[in-house]
Amino acid sequence: MGIIGAGHVGSTVAFILATQGICQEIIIKDLNLDTARGIALDMGHAASATKTHTIVRVANEPSDLRGCDVVVFCAGSPRQPGMSRDDLLLANAKVIRTVLSEVKPYIQESVLVMVSNPLDAMVYTAIKESGLSPLQVLGMAGILDSARMASFIFEKLGYGSDQIVASVMGGHGDDMVPLPRYSNVAGVPITELLEPQEIEEIIHRTRNAGAEIVGYLKKGSAYFAPAKSTAIMVEAILKNSHQVFPCSVLLQGEYGYSDVVGGVPVKLGSRGVCEIIELELLHEERERFDQSIQSVKSLIDALYHHAFFVSSRP
């Protein structure tokens, strides 16, 4: 598998995959070759220490990514304090265009996992720029947001950390849609375990978790949880597990939307998206989901407004 961008998230994804022996070979591509070489060498030592025998090497040329089953795209500018994901829109869209123009001839058989923010708009951009089927391009967000929600549920309850299932849909931003009704502890809905005010606090912290971390770090943003969430996706794809995870994908009629990306439950396999699962949403849940998708649509519209894409919007 390949990793584009050897910053905090990309290198941590590589570390997790290498030390768990999830893949045979990891190829790291970064603008700074020396940085990539140093990380690859260090990572290879870590793999050896854990007896996984995963090979970690550097992509000296774009063609070195040929044959990768999965390519994780982490390149781009991170969020800084006071910066929203939306501020990153044009800058990171240009990064995606530049990098994919170099590597796309060699990744046509790969599944492309996007991590760069603003996530949903970057997934859309990658679909447009890569030439891949929309089923081969998906974004890592829902697993991360659900993990954050599960962590906050555990903070409130104080038990059942390994039995908590949290569900978050919609865009990866301030309008994401945590779903308490689909969140449970060993099958018991959290609506039966927590007071409404406690659930609202969990929803608020889930939506603002990324910004909260940025505020504490001052420089940079979260990377441990995003990297682990990405590694979970990669493992499911490589193992053709058909496990269901919330992922950001292009909607083509699902939930009544087309030509827009949103986070929804997806069955993952070796070719990417096997199936998009449509949940039944109550009226209030549906309204929040619609609002979230409209926020993503406004970002995509902004890219068209700035004439980023050659073609007009379908």
UniProtKB/Swiss-Prot annotation:
MF term (GO), any: L-lactate dehydrogenase activity
Superkingdom: Bacteria
Active site residues per record: 172
EC top class, as a word: oxidoreductase
The entry's keywords: NAD, Oxidoreductase, Tricarboxylic acid cycle
Family statement drawn from the similarity comment of this UniProt entry: Belongs to the LDH/MDH superfamily. MDH type 3 family.
HAMAP family: Malate_dehydrog_3
Name of the protein in question: Malate dehydrogenase
